Regions:
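Glycan-association/targeting regions that enable binding to alpha-glucans and other polysaccharides
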Residues: 779-923
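Short, well-ordered secondary-structure micro-motifs within conserved domains or adaptor modules
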Residues: 73-102
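Catalytic-core regions of glycoside hydrolase
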Residues: 64, 68-71, 76-78, 149-151, ...
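Feature activates predominantly on carbohydrate-active enzymes
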Residues: 55-58, 62, 105-316, 330-334, ...
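N-terminal secretory signal peptides and thylakoid transit peptides that target proteins
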Residues: 2-20
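Second-shell loop/turn segments in exported
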Residues: 42-50, 182-186
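C-terminal segment of N-terminal export signals and the immediately downstream linker at the start
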Residues: 26-43
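C-terminal non-catalytic alpha-helical accessory regions
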Residues: 495-764, 768-769
Length: 923
């Protein structure tokens, strides 16, 4: 974070809003007639900074809310007579004892230490850190404990020491302005920003990204476009007097009688808010990042555009953008980073390098360090070198799981559709990202090169989870581990509700789209997702953090029902990431929205497919996984079953079994929670329960539909009558699960939950039922009209397959151990060993294969058979393969006569990395 100067004592107290020792000595700890003192050393170079003063204010207010006015002091001897002394200092307190704990602050950035002891004869807590951000986290930890406490200890009883350090260098939240109707209320609301930024800092996010120009994939078909090309909405640039924004419609899209220029007053109001937001972000020790995703100033094929930019030409465009950005950087000194989309969707044709060279002059000339974060799609060495030439820190932001949210690891491979091929290469606007760099679209591509001039940041795109409440601590911890995969910088999360109202689909009345006004929160809609932010923020900071960090919030909300509330949401939150990972009809969030799923037909030609970003024919069984290396499609799995082969991947049957387990656990927990009337009577508790029930319904639907798809594929291949009948039965079960869920949701959410203009991006669960019914009816007719084929051998195979698919998935159990390699020497073989044998002493002949690949999604996996001796398998990644610019990754497949099992595979919550990666190099 930026350098922060020590501020004078009087200013510090003013920022805290506290009284001095003399003025507050009479205010005591009411229950015992004793006082609490907060000691902040006046000359401490860390504790006496403005952001720490803000954090101390939070602690002061938390205690005040409990009826205690703490005494502020600058030295320990001013705290005499206290029942508790809280010392905020980067150096050891005077006249203090803290047991055997080291008398020194943490040394690594953003780390914190809270240790109990005694100061001036009183019980004491010492909060220490190596920098202001770590100190903020320590002080806010105490403030949060106080606010969530329900007894006289105020949550401040600490045994020993609390010591934490960040696992990820970047822990970011992005909030995008996509709708004039739905987003202006929060953009202009200063109280919203106070509360929202307080929450981000409390949950240990260290970066906030305000994104403009994020709502469209292309500068065409544009309607709602406020801030889409942001500069003229914010600043008046000298030398460009003719540049102005003309309003063509009302905010909801009704044409005006004549265009009206957006006023100087509105522009100044917009810019004043940007200055305010960036300053308030910095005041809490957060890095402020400004995202500018679109640099097009004209839209094509956009007759319904709400605005038009006048006064720019192709000749003045780049220089105008440079000069406008320079003004913004000068007037908003808290901007510490800029995020750019640099491929064709920005409106700048790929290969237009002079534009970016000109724009970057504003950054290199701003007089301070400003990070350049370039979106990875279409990135190439020319753009990387251009950014590095500015002398500024450079990051490349890769999508974590395409434009969706998968499980807590990085996909082991990309879909075949993302692999560059000559017949797929495009020219013109997307000559790079849809050409030889096609594999950069949805992942980390080939970014992990040794000696790179940039850092890698992952971005969790808002495709899978947008509208419903989600929060699984196990999954968040898994994402925390994978955010620094091979020493990446971390993760940026697109906030819940991202894209709400985009493409001119905004609807007044609140982004959460509830029917009941009691459930709406206006601009404070983030409060619905307070638990999501807490779980993800705290676990991105430290994946091993104590569960108390989120459970104390649950206890303050649900009381005795806290545990079952956590279990219900955690299991429900695994449904959609699992489906996204294992079965992806489109990588684009523009097309695929599994929360409100548009039905993909099982039966060929029963209805038009809503998706075409998937293998042909466009039916349910041919859809591949987002990770096709570890998950099989329905056709792939059924072919292996019918041919008597083995499939060394997780199957759709595995996925259905997991979904059934998660929904059963969530269902039981939410029923238990509902039985506690006091736990579900509040509006926020109703939000919790209803969203869990919707996700349970989705899980039941997909589990049954996957089984139906498997059975129908067997039927198509064999004509086996029973498989067809069971397919209809399972599809009927899926349909009933969806119908029941949708019917209840009709009483909770509006009929139009809008995330875009097309039917697939808006509407309600009830809207999707006719598509399901159409396909189910086609399946009934197909099965009823079929003739039993004469191939009895196929029928026998089908009978065995049907029996397998009608039960939960089962895998043989093995006792395995493997010590992952810590490093590799380029040019030398990387030897690995696996100790594996059947569990429970069973006698079974095993073989093992080693799968390996560079950490480069432009390459495919290789396989080598391992040598076995006494239950130990040995293999090696060849030296000529390790001699590369990339880290290496690997996993094992154990083979028996009738099965293939992955190792390490997944844990019970599907939240771990199912392979090993080695990025450190040795000589």
């Amino acid at each position: 974070m930026a350098h922060l100067n020590v501020i004078p004592r009087r200013q510090f107290l003013k920022l805290v809003g506290a009284t001095t020792v003399a003025g507050a000595a009479g205010r005591t700890y009411a229950s015992a007639g004793r006082k609490i003192s907060i000691v902040v050393h006046e000359a401490d170079p860390i504790a006496s900074t403005k952001p720490v003063a803000w954090a101390v204010k939070q602690l002061y207010q938390a205690l005040s809310e409990k009826g205690i006015a703490p005494v502020m002091a600058s030295r320990e001897n001013e705290a005499s007579g206290s029942s508790l002394v809280i010392v905020v200092s980067s150096t050891a307190p005077q006249s203090a004892t803290f047991g055997r704990s080291p008398q020194m602050a943490p040394q690594s950035i953003e780390s914190l230490r809270i240790v109990s002891g005694r100061v001036a004869g009183a019980e004491a807590l010492w909060v220490s850190a190596a920098d202001a951000r770590g100190m903020i986290y320590g002080v806010l930890e105490l403030a949060d404990r106080v606010r969530c406490s329900s007894d006289a200890s105020l949550g401040l009883r600490v045994t020993g020491a609390i010591e934490e350090s960040p696992a990820n260098r970047v822990r970011s939240v992005a909030r995008a302005f996509c709708s004039e109707v739905e987003d202006k209320p929060w953009y202009y609301d200063k109280q919203f920003w106070q509360d929202y930024l307080d929450m981000l800092a409390l949950n240990r996010f260290n970066r906030f990204n305000l994104a403009f120009g994020f709502g469209y994939d292309f500068p065409q078909g544009v309607t709602g476009d406020y801030f889409h090309f942001p500069y003229p909405y914010l600043v008046d640039v000298p030398g460009y007097a003719d540049v102005r924004v003309m309003q063509l419609t009302t905010p909801d899209g009704k044409p005006l009688p004549a265009p009206v220029q957006v006023s100087k007053e509105e522009r100044e109001k917009n810019f004043e808010m940007l200055r305010y937001i960036s300053a308030e972000t910095g005041a809490r020790g957060l890095q402020f990042q400004l995202g500018i995703w679109t640099h097009a100033y004209q839209w094509t094929r956009s007759p319904g555009a709400h605005h038009n930019i006048e006064g720019l030409t192709p000749e003045t465009h780049a220089a105008y953008c440079r000069d406008a950005l320079a003004i913004i950087l000068k007037e908003c000194p808290e901007i510490q980073g800029l995020t750019f989309r640099v491929h064709g969707e920005s409106g700048i044709p790929e290969g237009s390098y002079p534009f970016w060279e000109t724009l970057f002059e504003a950054i290199s000339g701003c007089g301070r360090s400003v990070e350049i974060d370039m979106h990875a799609k279409g990135i190439n060495q020319i753009m990387i070198d251009m950014a590095a030439k500015t002398g500024m820190p450079v990051k490349v932001g890769a999508k974590s799981w395409a434009e969706q949210m998968g499980l807590g690891y990085h996909q082991a491979d990309i879909r075949e559709l993302e692999i560059p091929r000559p017949d797929r290469n495009e020219s013109g606007l997307f000559s790079v990202s849809n050409g030889e760099r096609r594999f950069t679209r949805y992942g980390y591509a080939d970014l992990y090169q040794e000696g790179r001039k940039y850092d890698i940041l992952f971005r969790l795109w808002p495709g899978t989870q947008r509208h419903l409440l989600w929060g699984d601590p196990a999954m968040a911890a898994g994402y925390s581990e994978t955010a620094h995969f091979c020493n990446a910088a971390g993760l940026e999360i697109c906030e819940p509700l991202t894209f709400k109202g985009r493409e001119g689909s905004g609807i007044p009345g609140g982004r959460c789209a509830y029917l009941d006004e009691e459930l709406q929160r206006g601009p404070q809609d983030w409060k619905k997702f307070a638990y999501t932010y807490r779980v993800w923020g705290r676990l991105l900071y430290n994946p091993a953090t104590s569960p108390d960090a989120w459970q104390r919030q649950l206890s303050s909300r649900f009381g005795a029902g806290a545990s079952v509330a956590e279990t219900a949401l955690a299991n429900a939150s695994r449904v959609l990431p699992l489906i996204t990972t294992a079965h992806l009809p489109s990588a684009s969030n523009h097309s695929y929205w599994p929360e409100i799923y548009a039905n993909m037909p099982i039966v060929p030609d029963s209805e038009p497919s809503p998706y075409n970003d998937t293998p042909k024919p466009f039916i349910f069984s041919t859809v591949t996984a987002l990770d096709p290396q570890l998950f099989s499609s329905i056709t792939e799995y059924v072919s292996a079953l019918m041919d008597g082969g083995k499939c060394a991947k997780y199957s759709p049957l595995d996925v259905a079994t997991w979904l059934e387990g998660f929904t059963t656990a969530s269902d039981a927990a939410i029923s238990s929670l509902h039985s506690r009337a006091s736990a579900t009577s509040k509006p926020e508790s109703r939000q919790w329960e209803e969203d869990v029930l919707i996700q349970i319904g989705l899980g039941k639907f997909f589990a049954a539909k996957l089984r139906s798809g498997l059975l129908y594929e067997i039927y198509r291949k064999s004509g086996h009558p029973k498989s067809g009948q069971l397919a209809v039965s399972k599809y009927s079960e899926a349909r009933e699960a969806w119908a029941a869920m949708a019917q209840r949701a009709k009483g909770v959410y509006r009929s139009d939950i809008s995330y875009g203009r097309t039917p697939g991006r808006r509407g309600h669960w009830a809207d999707r039922l006719p598509g399901i019914d159409l396909d189910l009816d086609a399946m009934r007719k197909a099965v009823a009209a079929a003739q039993t084929p004469p191939d009895q051998a196929q029928l026998a195979k089908a009978e065995l397959a049907v029996k397998l698919i009608s039960e939960p998935a089962h895998h043989p159990a093995y006792d395995c151990s493997h010590t992952p390699a810590h490093s590799f020497a380029p040019g030398k073989p990387l030897s690995v060993e696996l100790d594996a044998r059947p569990a429970n002493g069973k006698h079974e002949k095993l073989s093992a294969d080693l799968y390996y690949r560079h950490v480069n999604q432009g390459e495919r996996w290789r396989t080598v058979s391992m040598h076995e001796a006494g239950g130990k398998f040995a293999g090696a990644i060849p030296g000529d393969y390790t001699n590369s610019l990339y880290p290496v990754q690997y996993y094992f497949v154990l083979n028996s006569d009738d099965s293939a099992t992955l190792y390490p595979g997944f844990n019970s919550t599907l939240s771990n990395q199912p392979y090993y990666a080695v990025w450190k190099r040795s000589s």
